[in-house]
Design a protein with these regions (language model features):
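Active-site-adjacent loops and short helices of periplasmic peptidoglycan-processing enzymes
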Residues: 1-109, 115-123
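Domain-terminus/edge residues, biased toward the C-terminal soluble/receptor-binding domains
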Residues: 89, 100-105, 109-322
Length: 322
């Protein structure tokens, strides 16, 4: 979550990636894995991000939190607010670095949700997670290798983040991107919590990723900005309303079960202009047999302006007869 908020601050220009941040006494004295920065330094945001991600530097994490929010306490408030906004219902933060604290909790599902949103919302910063080695100039050469062993074992793996405390065990949120026949590029995430060692978490993560690619098919239902449905529109300058999604609609299903998929459009009727581009009008339910897998809003792909007086009057009569 610390990385998510830092990337959000960069995106919204609250901080700049080349900007230097001071290292407080609090950051300098952080226990656990560190980047080995000290209060005599002013460190660029870009290097602090690398220290946080590659070296799991608790000192870098606190320096970033203070740089974004002014204080660790305020940053933790932002973390919890964002967790609620993202739908991480079983997560509560007590600090930005992830060290054990009473009430500091999360789940595998919430971490998967956070990782998905981070990669979707901030794709320009995802390459940070694939960096294998990093050391800030003037600091010791210790702790300069990424602890995500899959980066060194599997060329398709490009992240994401390790974690370890005595209470939580060895944890890893891993991401992989592979080119598959007749499918194209497909990304999967895995979450392993509570493993007994670095090697164990890497092995279990590898098993999960391989299983995900072999046991499930990715089925593209519609392309981005493709009209899913074109219902008639009343009192408008155009006869139909094009509804779809700005993202490709892709669903993962057990291998060989794609033929069971079906879609159901839920929308108001009649549809009376005007309609603005991007306006939500109904939804698309994706079903597998009688089971609803998920539901996405249908958005207006092309605006429909209101017709002139005569056109509206004519459609009013037709609606009344209907």
């Amino acid at each position: 979550m610390t990385a998510y908020l830092v990337f959000d601050a960069l995106k919204n220009r609250k901080i700049d990636i080349k900007q230097t941040l001071p290292v407080s006494e609090r950051a300098w004295k952080m226990p656990g894995s560190r980047m080995f920065i000290d209060p005599k330094m002013k460190v660029p945001v870009e290097d602090l991000i690398k220290g946080m991600i590659v070296q799991s530097g608790n000192d870098a994490t606190v320096a970033l939190a203070e740089g974004v929010a002014g204080s660790v306490e305020r940053f933790v408030q932002l973390m919890n607010d964002q967790a609620v906004f993202l739908g991480m219902h079983n997560t509560h933060y007590k600090n930005p670095e992830g060290l054990t604290a009473p009430g500091h909790t999360t789940t595998a599902r919430d971490l998967a949700l956070l990782a998905t949103r981070l990669m979707r919302d901030f794709p320009d910063y995802v390459p940070f997670y694939a960096i294998k080695k990093y050391r800030y100039e003037g600091t010791p050469a210790a702790n300069d290798t990424n602890r995500n062993l899959l980066l060194f074992r599997d060329a398709s793996v490009d992240g994401l983040k390790t974690g370890h405390t005595q209470a939580a065990g060895y944890c890893l949120v891993a991401s992989a991107k592979r080119e598959l026949p007749n499918v194209g590029t497909r990304r999967l995430l895995s979450v392993v919590l509570g493993a007994e060692s670095e090697n164990a978490r890497a092995n279990e993560s590898q098993k999960l990723l391989n299983w995900g690619y072999s046991a499930f098919d990715a089925v593209k239902l519609f392309d981005a900005n493709q009209a899913v449905v074109t219902p008639p529109v009343w009192k408008g300058k155009q006869p139909v309303l094009k509804l779809g999604s700005v993202r490709p609609l892709v669903v993962a299903v057990p291998a060989g079960s794609a033929a069971q998929l079906k879609t159901q459009v839920v929308r108001p009727d009649p549809l009376v202009a005007p309609f603005a581009k991007g306006q939500a009008v109904g939804s698309l339910k994706v079903m597998q047999g009688d089971k609803a897998l998920f539901e996405v809003p249908l958005l207006v792909l092309e605006p429909v302006e209101q017709a002139g007086v005569l056109g509206r009057a004519w459609d009013a009569v037709r609606l009344w007869i209907k």
